[in-house]
Amino acid sequence: MGINASHVPETCYHHCNQTFESSRQCFKWCQELARKDEYKIYGYPYSTNTRRVLAVLHEKGLSYDPITVNLIAGDQKKPSFLAINPFGQVPVFLDGGLKLTESRAISEYIATVHKSRGTQLLNYKSYKTMGTQRMWMAIESFEFDPLTSTLTWEQSIKPMYGLKTDYKVVNETEAKLEKVLDIYEERLKNSSFLASNSFTMADLYHLPNIQYLMDTHTKRMFVNRPSVRRWVAEITARPAWKRACDVKAWYHKKKN
């Protein structure tokens, strides 16, 4: 007899498989966990941080209940949402009684709980592979994201709020991004992806801002570098990422 372990942490799943014959109570417990309510995510489908978490959920083939926090309407500043996250930011991720904020922390949690399911996003087979991946995840957070978030805000998000793009800021930020992308180009000449020759969380973290920037003048900075262009084309074409960007699916609560 098998069990549906889509939401059961691996430790529980393996333990109960081993003890099932002698422990009906353990098996019943695992069945109850497997049938528990799906994950809930408070977010906004246009939010880069929300999309980062959605990409992980889709890479793992997990279902979720999307709860809209309309950032343009200011829902994140309302007392009802601040009671959920006092920082007033999305996403907020609920797994039963566990509440998590910060998209990268949420992403690593999901990928760790479901490490044997779907795409292997955390390549921690050895200390060396772990170190390399963690390094590139940090590079994304501290070198790539601050610049590309500024460019995304100025060119893509501001217009949603009816605000004008500050092209002086754009030009200054692009000058800094040039140096970062030169380093990426050298890395990607010798590696299919950033952390290894397979797609990992280090690549996934880059997707939200890249997706927006591909529709701006900044696109040229990515396509003018052959190795970066190849990498961008490959990661943005992933089915899980396309689903993460499907705004209609969010509002229609389309699930896996």
From Swiss-Prot:
GO cellular component, as recorded: cytoplasm; cytosol; mitochondrion
Residues covered by the GST C-terminal domain: 126-256
Primary localisation category: cytoplasm
GO MF: glutathione transferase activity
Catalyses which reaction(s): RX + glutathione = an S-substituted glutathione + a halide anion + H(+)
Entry keyword set: Cytoplasm, Detoxification, Transferase
Coiled coil region boundaries: none
UniProt binding sites for glutathione: 47-48, 76-77, 89-90, 102-103
Compartmental location: Cytoplasm, Cytosol
Ranges of residues in domain GST N-terminal: 37-118
Domain of life, source organism: Eukaryota
Pfam family, one: GST_N
Family, similarity comment: Belongs to the GST superfamily. Phi family.
Task performed by this protein: May be involved in the conjugation of reduced glutathione to a wide number of exogenous and endogenous hydrophobic electrophiles and have a detoxification role against certain herbicides.
Protein name per its UniProtKB record: Glutathione S-transferase F5
Organism: Arabidopsis thaliana (Mouse-ear cress)
Organism classification: Eukaryota, Viridiplantae, Streptophyta, Embryophyta, Tracheophyta
